[in-house]
Amino acid sequence: MGDWSFLGNILEEVNEHSTVIGRVWLTVLFIFRILILGTAAEFVWGDEQSDFVCNTQQPGCENVCYDEAFPISHIRLWVLQIIFVSTPSLVYVGHAVHHVRMEEKRKEREAEELSQQSPGNGGERAPLAADQGSVKKSSSSSKGTKKFRLEGTLLRTYVCHIIFKTLFEVGFIVGHYFLYGFRILPLYRCSRWPCPNVVDCFVSRPTEKTIFILFMLSVASVSLFLNILEMSHLGLKKIRSAFKRPVEQPLGEIPEKSLHSIAVSSIQKAKGYQLLEEEKIVSHYFPLTEVGMVEASPLSAKPFSQFEEKVGPGPLGDLSRAYQETLPSYAQVGAQEGVEEEQPIEAAAEPEVGDKSQEAERVSTEGEETLAVLEEEKVEPPEVEKEAEKEETPPEKVSKQELTPEKAPSLCAELPGEDTRPLSRLSKASSRARSDDLTV
């Protein structure tokens, strides 16, 4: 037979661009078809027509009977089968090589565009060129280790070539059955013209030829099974990837990026605008003032336990004493109201807490004397009272009293027996009057 090296070199390219099952199919094709067909089958069918003998002397009858028994030689049929089955693989290899060349050209074009966009970076061009050269060298020198992914149009072409291989395998198996059947009989009877009657013809090596036919049909069946298995493998792989894509895509394709906070100083501030920042919550402590304190001085923040100690309940005797010291009598309240009507309260004249307690005690001791003073005021001469008032009242109070002279007679008309002056003044006036009586 002829040289099969050319077809073998082409089919080696298919091995690089096919799946595992496709490589097994190529192994079956090379070893069990081409190798056996080239070594053993030629010797078995070498004397096919010369050994076909018929029991007639009619010229042409033997040739006509051989043509009817074997319309095409088995060897030539199997060669055609190998060629037709390998043709889709050759088409696929051509498309794969074209795809690889286009990818290489696209990468070279992108590299040139990158080099043109950065003309100043001369130092960076050298390692890029070295990497590209290494990639080209590895793809050209180490062909066996090169990985190729089946996707897109390349995958569709691969599936189509498997379908055509399957169709050709089925077609040749069916054709072989209709032409020869699956066995060769040693006796063949022929009645074609120009044979005078039914002629008996005898086939050489029928058992050996039957074994070869069965072997080749079994190899064709294995190739057909591998094609179907490869189709199912690709289909299941595609379905599995379609089911896994919506689950794995968001986890794998989301890039991990550090999110900048609002208050980062690296953000450029626009003119007239300020970055939004959260205000820090400042805790203020407002301590409770102690009982009896008029003004609470600002205190620094202290632990809560100290405030609990200050605010904690004390003995009942202390509280009653504090209330006695701070609560004024009815007479003091009336005196304060009279002073508020006559003049505003002066801040500088407010007594301290200790003076208030002393004055409250003094007022309580002198409460009895005020009743006697009120009775003696009717007998005392008015000049003494006026002098005492002039000595005690400052000029500001005198001017304010002169501005409101109408209030005194009205109050006297309503309450003729009572005096509206404060008790402190009355006590001082009474003591002054008593001293004057003694001197007189």
Curated annotation (Swiss-Prot):
The keyword Cell membrane applies. Residues 108-144, 334-440 are annotated as: Disordered. GO terms for molecular function: gap junction channel activity. Residues 423-432 have a biased composition (Low complexity). Pfam families: Connexin, Connexin50. It is a multi-pass membrane protein. Keywords: Cell junction, Cell membrane, Disulfide bond, Gap junction, Membrane, Transmembrane, Transmembrane helix. Residues 13-21, 93-161, 232-440 are cytoplasmic. GO terms for biological process: cell-cell signaling; gap junction-mediated intercellular transport. Disulfide bonds join 54-201, 61-195, 65-190. Its main location: membrane. One of its GO terms (cellular component) is connexin complex. It is found in: Cell membrane; Cell junction, Gap junction. Residues 2-12 dip into the membrane without crossing it. Residues 43-71, 183-210 are extracellular. The chain crosses the membrane at residues 22-42, 72-92, 162-182, 211-231. The keyword Transmembrane helix applies. Residues 353-365, 375-405 have a biased composition (Basic and acidic residues). InterPro entries: Connexin (IPR000500), Connexin50 (IPR002266), Connexin_CCC (IPR019570), Connexin_CS (IPR017990), Connexin_N (IPR013092), Connexin_N_sf (IPR038359). Detected in eye lens (at protein level). Eye lens. Belongs to the connexin family. Alpha-type (group II) subfamily. Structural component of eye lens gap junctions. Gap junctions are dodecameric channels that connect the cytoplasm of adjoining cells. They are formed by the docking of two hexameric hemichannels, one from each cell membrane. Small molecules and ions diffuse from one cell to a neighboring cell via the central pore. A hemichannel or connexon is composed of a hexamer of connexins. A functional gap junction is formed by the apposition of two hemichannels. Forms heteromeric channels with GJA3. This is Gap junction alpha-8 protein.
